[in-house]
């Protein structure tokens, strides 16, 4: 799960589509049939038919139930959605969420579930910030973070009298890069693609071939 966060108009949707297309291309180079599904905010999975890359662009927290959000984000199991979506089986390889809210703020608004259950299922987050003085193509700053488990839980204030206890948080791994193409390449090559296409998926043994190893 990749979460892209930034203010309206900063280019979240464009970046989500660019990243999804590059993942699709890499899948096809690995002989994996790949396709992209962009979900609508009203009925996100009505037109979903097994695409392996899913873009959830500007969905609201209540676009899915808490249980359906968790099913979609589950990295280990195929997810049968609720009857609202006719029990569709959702089996994406990659989910790209684009939203103006931070993940912590977004998931805190989903009722009936601990926010940590959502945050720990996010692998990476890209945050986009507009420069105060933009210059041609280098008008944004891009950061990549990954989710880490905290050794000591921390409290996050989300309103005047409400706190969240966080067991997971985001750690920056690529900081303040204003070269979009360079940033995308590094993020994909070093962090996103290795998760999307684990080595065993494309190994000869995974394709039914045996390998004789000598030690």
Predicted segments with their positions:
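Hydrophobic anchor at the beta1->P-loop junction of P-loop NTPases
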Residues: 4
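Hydrophobic positions on the alpha1 helix immediately C-terminal to the Walker A/P-loop
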Residues: 15
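AAA+/P-loop NTPase substrate/partner-engagement loops
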Residues: 22-65
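Conserved lysine of the Walker
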Residues: 12
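The conserved Walker
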Residues: 8
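Pre-Walker A adenine-sensing motif
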Residues: 1
